[in-house]
Amino acid sequence: MGLEKSLILFPLLVLVLGWVQPSLARESPAMKFERQHMDSDGASSSSSTYCNQMMKRREMTKESCKPVNTFVHEPLADVQAVCSQENVTCKNGKQNCYKSTSALHITDCRLKDNSKYPNCDYKTSQYQKHIIVACEGNPYVPVHFDATV
């Protein structure tokens, strides 16, 4: 009797896991924000090759060259705290953007004019600027990097 139950339940388990697992592997908007914009230690951000290395490592040059990206060199908790700071209008007109109250250490990566995929070549520039992020969810966390000011 136990073997019969196992033979029935095992295929059901395989079906359920096959259905559930892909959704577990999907990257949430908050996880994507962290992958694309957070580099808390940022130890080598002063290197001229920082953007080339990080853009590749963080998978932003896989199918095309992402034209612009900003990395924030502050603790994740500090960037998440921006979601409770000054509410501002996003570039797309939505009202879920927030501006940091203090300037943060960032690295701006911009694709050079003569750069072509798959040889993505970026200009690396360091700044201390206020950031604007779009926030969503519960907990309310950054899901989109909107601008720097």
Swiss-Prot record:
Intrachain disulfide bonds: 51-109, 65-120, 83-135, 90-97
Catalytic activity from the UniProt record: an [RNA] containing cytidine + H2O = an [RNA]-3'-cytidine-3'-phosphate + a 5'-hydroxy-ribonucleotide-3'-[RNA]; an [RNA] containing uridine + H2O = an [RNA]-3'-uridine-3'-phosphate + a 5'-hydroxy-ribonucleotide-3'-[RNA]
UniProt xrefs under SUPFAM superfamilies: RNase A-like
Signal peptide per UniProt: 1-25
Residues of the active site: 37, 144
Protein name: Ribonuclease pancreatic
Main location: secreted
SMART domains documented for this protein: RNAse_Pc (SM00092)
Keywords per UniProt: Disulfide bond, Endonuclease, Hydrolase, Lyase, Nuclease, Secreted, Signal
UniProt-recorded Gene Ontology molecular function terms: lyase activity; nucleic acid binding; ribonuclease A activity
Localization of this protein: Secreted
Database matches in PROSITE patterns: RNASE_PANCREATIC (PS00127)
Gene3D superfamilies from the UniProt entry: Ribonuclease A-like domain (3.10.130.10)
Stated role: Endonuclease that catalyzes the cleavage of RNA on the 3' side of pyrimidine nucleotides. Acts on single-stranded and double-stranded RNA.
Native source organism of the sequence: Uranomys ruddi (White-bellied brush-furred rat)
